[in-house]
Amino acid sequence: GSVNIFNYDEIVEKAGGQNNAFTSNDITNYYITLPKENLEQAFRLESDRMLGLAFTPKSLEVQRQVVVEEFKQNYLNQPYGDIHLLLRSLAYKKHPYQWPTIGKEVSHIENATMDEVKSFFYKHYAPNNAILVVAGDVELDQVKHLSEKWFGSIVRRESHIRNIPTEPQQTK
């Protein structure tokens, strides 16, 4: 939730929609599926998330537990689940892809601090570092209008150049 919207999921569900998110090494993808009549609701919710994500000890602990359970489900609780963790460090020696998005071990998640989470959010979550995709039976002019209305006033954040090291050629 955010400082303004505590019941994000409930609002989406009442509008006839659903939402979720996933991460990869290169992106975090938040998505909402709603009837077109409620399109503006999605813009309002996402701009509010970008403007005022709620950073509370409770929200951090809830998300920490969710991610720990995802880690266990994906890597520890299934046969050969840890193979992806093991292969990364074999395939990549310098590139950030050597590190799993979710952390290399449960302690990485458990020990994440509020300051680290805030720093990451404020470094990466801004309209100038986001891609908005709207699909369905909607008009382009409406999407442009809603984009400007809900995201236009959000302050750009400093762009960060990712200095990704060149991965040495693999010989084995």
Model segments located where?
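M16/MPP (pitrilysin/insulinase) zinc-metallopeptidase core fold and M16-derived inactive scaffolds
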Residues: 1-33, 99-103
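Acidic/histidine-enriched alpha-helical segments
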Residues: 13, 54-72, 139, 158-171
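Non-catalytic accessory/assembly modules
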Residues: 58-65, 78-86, 138, 145
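Histidine-acidic residue clusters that define the catalytic metal-binding segment
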Residues: 89-130, 158-166
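An aromatic/glycine/proline-enriched structural segment found at the starts
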Residues: 94, 98, 131-172
